Amino acid sequence: MTDSTHPPFHNEPHGDSLGDRLNWLRAAVLGANDGIVSTAGIVVGVAGATDSRATLLTAGLAGLLAGSMSMAAGEYVSVSTQRDSEKAALALERRELREQPLEELEELTELLAARGLSEKVAREAAEQLTRRDALRAHASVELGIDPDALTNPWHAAGASFLAFTVGALLPLLAMVLSPLSLRLLVTVVSVLAALALTGWWSARLGAASVGPALLRNMGGGALAMGVTYAAGALLKAAGV
């Protein structure tokens, strides 16, 4: 009987933890991708208008800092909202367990039965889990939350800031460190190579086809650089 009560309660947090790790990794890849594309668009666009290394560096750094701070702030707000929702759900569950324990036991039994357990086994499992840790049982089975592993907005913000910054540094350094005659070529090639890598990672993490992911990622980056370079060149030709 003990074995039959383990899967619903103990296996789910492991699955959630794996899902959380994959979500963090996917977010890091996408953050780096955003840094690559947005900063590449900025420095290539400016390069279309001027050859000044100082101007390119200033524009690139401004874009890097603005983008990384925006990503971090957005992630902080988003994850803080999620954490508040998780806390509120746990508080409600705690109150319901205190005020109506029998109804909550019935609810847990029904949830376990819905996962394929017989009514008798589900009842026994629910009783054992309730005696062990009622809040944790309901949080895991009913809410899909680990009370000891709530999302951390500061970690999320820091990860987004770092991912975007790492991605943004590639086109910025390629542009300002390369010789003038090779500046655009080195930047475009390095950006497309990096986008191929992040596209491959995104496809692998999402169990999707690699080819279309590479085409979308590299095509989007190439389009961004082409449009911004054309805009910069037009401004230069207009004497702006």
Residue spans for each PLM region:
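Hydrophobic alpha-helical transmembrane segments
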Residues: A28, L56-L61, W154-F161, L184-V189, ...
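Internal alpha-helical transmembrane segments
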Residues: T2-S78
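Juxtamembrane boundary at the C-terminal end of a transmembrane helix
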Residues: Y229-V240
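Small-residue-rich segments of transmembrane alpha-helices in multi-pass membrane proteins
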Residues: G167, R216-Y229
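Transmembrane alpha-helical segments and their cytosolic interface motifs
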Residues: W24-V43, P147-L173
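C-terminal ends of transmembrane helices
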Residues: Y76-S80, D146-P147, G199-S209
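Transmembrane alpha-helical segments of integral membrane proteins
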Residues: L170, V189, A193-A208
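Cytosol/matrix-facing amphipathic helices and coiled-coil assembly/linker segments
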Residues: T2-A27, V79-F161
